[in-house]
Amino acid sequence: MKFIKYFFGLTFLLPAFLLAQTKATISIENKSNLDFKEAVVSVKWDAIISKFPQIDTSAFVVINDKTKKQIPFQLEHRGLKAIQNLLLQVDVKANTSLSVTVQKGKPEKVIVKTYGRYVPERKDDFAWENDIIAFRAYGKALEKTKEDAYGLDVWVKRTTKMVINDRYKKGDYHIDHGDGMDYYHVGFSLGAGNMAPYINDTIRYSGNYNQWKVLDNGPLRITFQLMFDTWNAGGIKVKAAKTISLDAGSQFNRIENVYSFDGDKPMPVVVGIIKRPEAGIVSLNEKQGMMAYWEPTHLEHGTTGIGVLLTSPVSTMMVSEKQILAKTIVKSNEPIVYYTGAAWDKAGKIANSKQWNSYLENFQKQTQTPLIINLK
């Protein structure tokens, strides 16, 4: 009799146990007063596996429990063979939560919204983009040429399509063919938010990057690394590695720099924005670590806004004739994280300095109060 009772007990428990192995429910909570729109959130893959150990990475879907529609996702590897995170693009209104379920199914094709690559055919450029904006960094082949530049470049766009390959193929990306162009001038500056050592009141530029590695390449997030040869930064031998991420739907890159140099003493660094000779609008907030620059309008091409958000304490901000700078410090082999990005008025989303400053403020608040992820 005891055996029969035990057997029936297992029979009732078995369906619930099996059900728990065939799905994972994720709660995404927004405790802020701001709406998160098209936000890319990260869920630890190990946590998914713990709830859904039999998941087939080629045959699962993520379902919005309210609308029953599929949610776009990406398996993030961070340069490793094993999956590290599940990335989801979601909308979560202020002070609400969203429930989604990971379950077996045939996933819909996700629209590519981020992309980047090494561009050997254009003197070692590395270019990357999302569905809003595009950027590039300069490589070794450009050094000691009349085109040489040190900072980050911006390519403006007014299309959600990926444009990098088409623009390089045409070779005339300084002309607007209807979807944007490259009219941003970098020259011998930090451009659109690059970082460099600042020794004895002088920016100590590195050479251009000499190695690159793509860690993830869309469809929702691109992450890559740029490595720089050792250089003499005002008497300090410095080596640098920069890890850059750009999410779909965002105006901003996340940049994590690691500087290697001798000694325990912190090294001063600056993040900079090139300043135009004509009148633009500069907005600085040292306490918040925020720099915004609404450039003067560039002929018929429109107006570009550049912004920087630092996560480390800023000792001072400076406006010179040629650059806008924010000064902070780094320790050897310890990562420093900041955000830099751009907007274009002709893209139709951000039309003036007031809107650009508001975007920066809201973006910073969202990084400080991110969406909260829980698995059930």
Where do the model's predicted regions map?
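Bacterial Sec-dependent N-terminal signal peptides
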Residues: 1-25
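Alpha-mannosidase-like glycoside hydrolase catalytic domains involved in N-glycan trimming
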Residues: 21-116
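Solvent-exposed beta-strand/loop surfaces of large extracellular or lumenal domains
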Residues: 55-83, 232, 279-295, 304-316
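Extended acidic/polar, glycine-enriched regions
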Residues: 80-121, 269-281, 287, 291-295, ...
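Beta-strand-rich recognition/accessory modules
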Residues: 85-87, 308-376
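Solvent-exposed N-terminal domain segments of exported/luminal and surface proteins
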Residues: 106-203
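Extended, loop-rich substrate-binding clefts of extracytoplasmic carbohydrate-active enzymes
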Residues: 170-248
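Acidic (Asp/Glu-rich), glycine- and aromatic
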Residues: 240, 251-284
